[in-house]
Amino acid sequence: MTVYDAAAFAFGQAMNLWLLIAAINGALAVAAGAFGAHGLQGRLDAHQMEVFQTAARYHMYHALAIGLAALAARTGAASTQANVAATFFLVGIILFSGSLYLLSLTGIRALGFVTPFGGLAFLAGWIALAWAATKAV
């Protein structure tokens, strides 16, 4: 196996991992949305329900964004930036959506301080994806 073959193999594995992470997060976002719509109705007040649905919506948006970054990584010149974007999107899902899920379900307001960091991670992910797009051209 040449160095080129090894690099191509590692690159393909990273892309497959990001696609797997995107698919798992997409499924989790659908499950969360369904749980919120059917399992939590009547158990949460209107504000908590809105917070939960916001978490599920942004979870799905950024699960799709991870998949987009994985596809952008197919262009060798953009792979580093696309991997950075996918990482930021995943961190954003954990911090933003995760904190909102917990906040809506537990009512612990102290969790709210984490949410903006997740939003910043989402923004950084989109900037990194734009950077990847300039490299792919």
Question: Language model features by range: what are they?
Answer:
Residues 3-137:
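Polytopic transmembrane helical bundles with strong interfacial aromatic enrichment
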